[in-house]
Amino acid sequence: MFTVRKERIEFIVKGSKVIGHLFIPEDGKVKKYPAVFIDGPMTSVKEQVTGVYAKSLAELGFITLTIDHRYFGESEGTPRQYEKFPDKLLDIKNALDFLKKRPQVDERFISLVGVCLGAGYVVAAASEISGIYRLAAIAGYYRDTQEMKANNLHDFNSKVSSGKKAREQYESTGKVLYIPAASLNEEAAMQTKDTVDYYTKRAAVQNYENSFAVMSREFFTKFDVQIYAEKVTRPFLMIHSQKALSPHWADRFYNNVRTEKSRHFVESRGQTDFYDNFRIINECVQHTSKHLLPVKS
């Protein structure tokens, strides 16, 4: 077990400052470490689930980085609370460039880990970035927009349309239309009991805002994670549970991955057990660390 030093870092993406936490294992003997960028659920910030996994993996000898994406937390960018996946992918690319410049990082062994929707973001980013060592997805939210359309095309199109209208309103007036990110009592982006409990109670950190820009729906609704399964080219680990989000989507994604892959199931009561239940987190971290350890030729 390594002693870990946490460093506040920043880099610029399209003129906006991105703030992150870099977790550095301190050994005194090792000069270069494998590195991991960890991405998390929609609207989340670095002090929540990604920070937990970042610290835990750093204790096992990985340099880890987690950030507040643009529009969230301490990072700059407007409008606030804007869940726009093309911009999140660009943030990930810049985060990897940041890691490559750190003298302690072994560039040969930089991996991506995603939790919940972060799993979708990292597999999408990896399809556009060369040099990724390995991928791991923990309790991933493998959105299948084709199934969503088949189940309720009107609802799908309505959400896209409402997002477009909200964006046009913002562009013409500067006014952003918001709904809660998590709530059981009103329209919200997330409406499951365990998710609401996590964001409004257990992980209601000062840096988190329980808010979601409706204009996000123009992009977020159309984000199809399933299309990236066949684009996965790096060794892939999936960790999931039958009680996590949409296990049948996880099965579909895994079955369509054509490269080296492995899967591990854990027992959970729901999705957010993966966020702050340390029995489950420790199990996930152990399997993830083994998957990401460098295999040197």
Cite the ranges covered by each PLM segment.
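The serine-hydrolase catalytic nucleophile loop
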Residues: 42-55, 69, 250
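Catalytic active-site module of serine/aspartate enzymes centered on a nucleophile-bearing elbow/loop
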Residues: 267-297
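Catalytic nucleophile-loop/oxyanion-hole region of alpha/beta-hydrolase
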Residues: 46, 72-107, 111, 278-283
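Short beta-strand/loop motif that positions the catalytic acidic residue
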Residues: 232, 238-240
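Short beta-strand element of the alpha/beta-hydrolase
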Residues: 31-41
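N-terminal cap/lid segment of alpha/beta-hydrolase-fold proteins
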Residues: 1-31
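Conserved alpha/beta-hydrolase
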Residues: 56-76
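Alpha/beta-hydrolase-fold enzymes
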Residues: 123-201
